Amino acid sequence: MNPRLFSPHIIRSLLDLDAYKINMMQAIHHFYPDVSVRYELIVRSEEDASGLLDAIRQEIAHLGTLRFSDADIHYLTQHAPHLKATFLQSLRYFHFVPQEQVEMGIVKQGGKQQLRISIRGSWRDTILYETLVMAIVSEVRSRQRWAEVPADLPLKVLKTKLDQLKAEIERRGINNFSLTEMGTRRRFSSQVQRDVLACLKQEIPQWVLGTSNYHFAREFDLKPIGTIAHEWFMGHQALVNERDSQQVALERWLTAFDGMLAIAPTDTLTIDAFLNDFNRHLANAYDGVRHDSGCPFRWGDKMIAHYQQLGIDPTTKLFIFSDGLDFDQALELCEYFAGRVKISFGIGTFLTNDLANWRNAAGVEYRPLSIVIKLAECQGRPVAKISDQPEKAMCEDPIFLANLKRRFNIELDVDALIQELRHQKRSPRHYISAA
């Protein structure tokens, strides 16, 4: 194991996660302390990750040994003023119980094998797993299958990008670029993310707002940044009337944080369904919105028109773009929306897991593993993410999905629904290994 790329334990602090997970944990602690949930890992890549199972199991078991330290609580008290004292005190008693909460194995579906990770338990006690487990899966894969990557390559790639970024910003006279590093979940390794943040802070401090990772925010004295994720909205589909779920989620988030952290993702259902619920009260109360799927230019135009229709000056609002961005796309968006709205970027894999088409000795080109962990059930009921990008949609129950679309006047492809029902009947998931 190359110590310049990897460390013996992947996760060594419970703060080594995305800040929005702890934010949502507080809201759940307040509103839904007894709600049960199930999460599922989804491997979007064609690559079979089942061979990583044993090493992943060991790393997830290690999570059970970690606790929030006094220093962790003190840091959050000082740098996360939106977190209430009573909630922070409750973190002192928090710990994972992986042997009860996490089921791992290999699923056989359609004649192929794939890694399966299922997380179950109370929402409050399991919500922090997502970022940690994704980082574990990504790094185990890196050290088992791509250990021969030159240790200096990730930083070389990044520095080339930063040189090009600085030159383009100067050449084009762009003055509205800023970014938050959001690369924890799909990073090549923890050490690479550390090196990336050190490089960003040294090379472009004027454009780096902070990082979504509490652990590295503390280490590099950066601002920890995070608001809310699709999960909050998905859970409400099972907790209130489906048609009211989006508005209730938006309202309760404002209540949970007294109006702070008011940046809303718009694509849990689709941008059009979101705008139908994003009334003048909510549009005023929220500082801005986040784009995570679909065409960002059309999305931004639609959001600006919505604010104008409500009589709200869009230049007072913030648009955050976080959908698989690179610097070229970000600068195009800077130019397109200049003077029309405040913008910023959440950039992840492009920073923490890009090896610039590097190939191993066998000639295989490196590609990051595309994975997500998403809420599948809440209180034993299915939930869904529809998205503005079909490949990002997810729901285990096609009947529930069809009903949800009907309730929100989202177009339903009946032929696709019939095909999915036939496919589920023909090819149910078959678990051939579990622990």
UniProtKB/Swiss-Prot annotation:
What pathway annotation does it carry?
Answer: Cofactor biosynthesis; NAD(+) biosynthesis; nicotinate D-ribonucleotide from nicotinate: step 1/1
How is the polypeptide modified once translated? Transiently phosphorylated on a His residue during the reaction cycle. Phosphorylation strongly increases the affinity for substrates and increases the rate of nicotinate D-ribonucleotide production. Dephosphorylation regenerates the low-affinity form of the enzyme, leading to product release.
EC number(s)?
A: 6.3.4.21
Example GO BP: NAD biosynthetic process via the salvage pathway
One Pfam family assigned to this protein is NAPRTase
Modified sites of kind Phosphohistidine: 230
Q: Which GO terms describe its molecular function?
A: nicotinate phosphoribosyltransferase activity
**Which reaction is the catalytic activity of this chain?**
nicotinate + 5-phospho-alpha-D-ribose 1-diphosphate + ATP + H2O = nicotinate beta-D-ribonucleotide + ADP + phosphate + diphosphate
The source's domain of life comes to Bacteria
Give the matching SUPFAM superfamilies: Nicotinate/Quinolinate PRTase C-terminal domain-like, Nicotinate/Quinolinate PRTase N-terminal domain-like
* InterPro entries given in the database record: N/Namide_PRibTrfase, NAPRTase_N, Nic_PRibTrfase, Nic_PRibTrfase-Fam, Nicotinate_pribotase-like_C
One GO cellular component, as annotated: cytosol
Which UniProt key words apply to this protein? Answer: Ligase, Phosphoprotein, Pyridine nucleotide biosynthesis
**UniProt signal peptide:** none
Entry's PANTHER family? NICOTINATE PHOSPHORIBOSYLTRANSFERASE
What HAMAP family does the record tag this protein with?
Answer: NAPRTase
Belongs to which family? Answer: Belongs to the NAPRTase family.
Protein role: Catalyzes the synthesis of beta-nicotinate D-ribonucleotide from nicotinate and 5-phospho-D-ribose 1-phosphate at the expense of ATP.
Q: What is this protein called?
A: Nicotinate phosphoribosyltransferase
What is the gene name? pncB
